[in-house]
Amino acid sequence: MTYLRITLAALAALALGAGFTPATGAAQQKLKVHISVDMEGVGGVVTGEQLGPSGFEYGRFREFMTREALAAIEAATRAGATEIIVADSHGNGQNLLIDQLPAEVRVIRSWPRRLGMVAGIDDTVDAAIFIGYHAGTNNPAGVRAHTFSSANLTRVALNGTDVTEGSWNAAIAGHFGVPVIMMSGDDAAIAEVRKAVGDLEAAETKRSLGFHSALTLTPQASATLIGNRVSAAMSRRSAFRPLKVQTPVTVDVSFKHYLPSEILAYLPLFERTDSHSVRFRAKDMVEASAIMSFIGDYRPDITP
């Protein structure tokens, strides 16, 4: 018993000397963080050459995207996060170099997902972070601005207000009572999300000069800024509030071509509001997200 007391005392002294605080008897408080990672808002991204497998810079920018995600993960962990879920939410959903992420992180990859870019979020999550986000499709100022699909959609509105991916995903998080505390992306994307959720912490990785041009930070500078802003957000986490929308929700979707709206209107769920647009109603954001996922992901030739 004497030996045990001496050993415990020695260990405590070593821990204090290393800067640790001894436990008070209670288990470490759980703190769960969800990080949704897109790519258009990553520092340096300006054209499709950085955004998909056919682009000559895609391989390098997967590294930069991963570096930005890792900066957010490490900062959240230092601030006390005990569980982190990362959703790879760009393109095919298989962009992050997951072997470079900490072993404790869990990663959501590929599609389809009922909750889209924030798949994995629920009421056990304490905070949401958006990395690499971009402006919405009708914003003339954003780099690579679009909403969900640059190829197919020209507008998405929630309860009569145009939404971006950032504000839509914030509303899904809000359904579960989860606040968005930090985001990164270009100046236009940040302004849009702040308009929806309030003055969250933000890392401006670049300033838009046009759809395909920007004044950008370097990858290292972007990652450093993201880490700093995540740290700041985590330190005042209690100051943020979840985005709540009125339910049931009404969603308007406009397509680049007329045929999708014509065919969707065959279903009683959808009302065709003009040649290129449909409207649907959902009981909440979870149901609305599932319907939007159907619109975006369904094809009759899907295999297997």
Language model: regions and residue ranges:
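Mature N-terminal segment immediately following signal peptide/propeptide cleavage
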Residues: 28-48
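C-terminal accessory domains and tails appended to enzymatic cores
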Residues: 84, 222, 227-304
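Active-site glycine-rich loop that binds ribose-phosphate moieties when present
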Residues: 150-176, 185-188
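Active-site rim beta-loop-alpha module in soluble metabolic enzymes
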Residues: 172-180, 184-229
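A short alpha/beta connector and helix-capping loop motif
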Residues: 44-69, 201-205
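Bacterial N-terminal signal peptides
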Residues: 7-19
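A glycine-rich helix N-cap at a beta->alpha junction
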Residues: 103-121
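Alpha/propeptide regions of enzymes that mature by internal proteolysis
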Residues: 56-87, 93-94, 104-105, 229-236
